[in-house]
């Protein structure tokens, strides 16, 4: 890999930054960042071949506008957080003097509209999930009101078999 310098392409910098921060992040956080960087952020900026030193707030803003055609505002907010953090590190190690993401309008979060399954839909969901790797997370989510991220983020250490409790973090 190329050494980190300001002439590095932003897309290449992101790949190297991911390796640098990997030891400092929880596994689930790293997986989330990695997914966003690999699937959306790198492909967009790689196609535009923008050097880190030449990255402008408008480049980032146009990325957000492009992504809002594909994903929710909430997802683009997550992209913003990752890009901002990556560029903050670039400033810290003197690759760039300012963080262009500071000058970008953060996308608005989509309003949450809750929905729920009725008893027949729940029965169909349980039947469809039976015997799959999703059976337990779906069961826990349904009976304990867990969010998707809470259900998939559960660890054995969260279960206290002596006191029959489950700790959600």
Protein language model features and the residues they cover:
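Short, intrinsically disordered, charge-balanced linker/junction segments flanking boundaries
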Residues: 1-5, 161-169
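N-terminal helical hairpins
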Residues: 1-7, 19, 23-24
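N-terminal alpha-helical segment
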Residues: 13-14, 56-60, 118-121, 133-134
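Basic, Lys/Arg- and aromatic-enriched nucleic-acid-binding interface segment
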Residues: 73, 77-79, 92-98, 102-154, ...
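N-terminal core-binding DNA-recognition domain of tyrosine site-specific recombinases/integrases
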Residues: 18-95, 111
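Short, structural beta-strand-to-alpha-helix junction motif
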Residues: 7-13, 49-52, 155
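Non-catalytic, well-ordered alpha-helical scaffold segments
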Residues: 8-15, 61, 77-84, 102, ...
């Amino acid at each position: 890999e190329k050494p980190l310098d300001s002439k590095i392409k932003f897309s290449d910098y992101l790949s190297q930054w991911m390796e640098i921060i990997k030891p400092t992040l929880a596994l689930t956080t790293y997986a989330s960042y990695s997914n966003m960087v690999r699937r959306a952020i790198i492909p967009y900026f790689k196609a535009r071949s923008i050097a880190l030193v030449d990255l402008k707030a408008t480049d980032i803003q146009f990325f957000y506008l492009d992504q809002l055609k594909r994903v929710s505002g909430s997802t683009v907010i997550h992209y913003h957080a990752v890009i901002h953090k990556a560029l903050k590190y670039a400033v810290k190690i003197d690759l760039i003097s300012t963080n262009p993401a500071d000058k970008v309008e953060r996308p608005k979060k989509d309003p949450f509209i809750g929905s729920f399954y009725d008893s027949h839909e729940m029965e169909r969901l349980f039947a469809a999930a039976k015997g799959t790797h999703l059976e337990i997370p779906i069961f826990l989510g349904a009976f304990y009101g867990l969010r998707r991220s809470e259900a998939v983020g559960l660890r054995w250490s969260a279960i206290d078999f002596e006191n029959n409790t489950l700790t959600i973090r």
